[in-house]
Amino acid sequence: LLFVTGDLAAQNIHLSTPRTSLVLSAPAGGELKYVYYGSKLTENDCREVYNAPTMQHGAYPVYGMNCPGESALAVTHADGNMTLQMEVAGTEIKNTDGAVTAVIKLKDKVYPFSVNVCYKAYSDVDIIETWTEIAHAEKKNVMLRKFDSAFLPVRRGDVWLSSLYGSWANEGRLVQEPLEPGMKVIKNRDGVRNSHTAHAEVMFSLDGKPQENYGNVIG
């Protein structure tokens, strides 16, 4: 079962796969925020999540007015200003064969600069695809200094990171390590030959060191 619900006043968005749920808050004129991502919720559970005193995180934080943490998007406008302040301009829900796509339209409060944050939830597998679409109508070029395809906060705890690295004749070596405070960067500059070095694919184990047959993971 896959469904999406929307509260016309608050624009709450609930996307589900067979065993997971993603809940977003997208109030018109406000900030797009994550409310919940985890095991599948019923509609009653979803209402309880919105009412619970939980910490909500920005779903696509930008460099600008208030940016104490890492940003997903940073630009230099045509006039040299580096500030972004995005607000929800609207939402669109698209139903296609076997999937529901939610498009949350963000616009800057000052500049003609917009971002569509997109989520596509599938009905037959536990996959929620996410990407962004960036556009502007400024008079000159805008420089994109950072433009991540997605941003997902993970609750602090006994979280482990699994990734692959390698070299010629020694590809696909698995490394598993606890996720510590700070920044972990996995980078590959080898184009289509990325099996020879670090792989961009990662897996987060949310309840301790990864086990073969059980555990909660995000990959």
Task: Enumerate the language-model features and the residues they cover.
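Polysaccharide-binding surfaces and accessory modules of carbohydrate-active proteins
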Residues: 11-23, 32-219
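Bacterial Sec-dependent N-terminal signal peptides
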Residues: 1-11
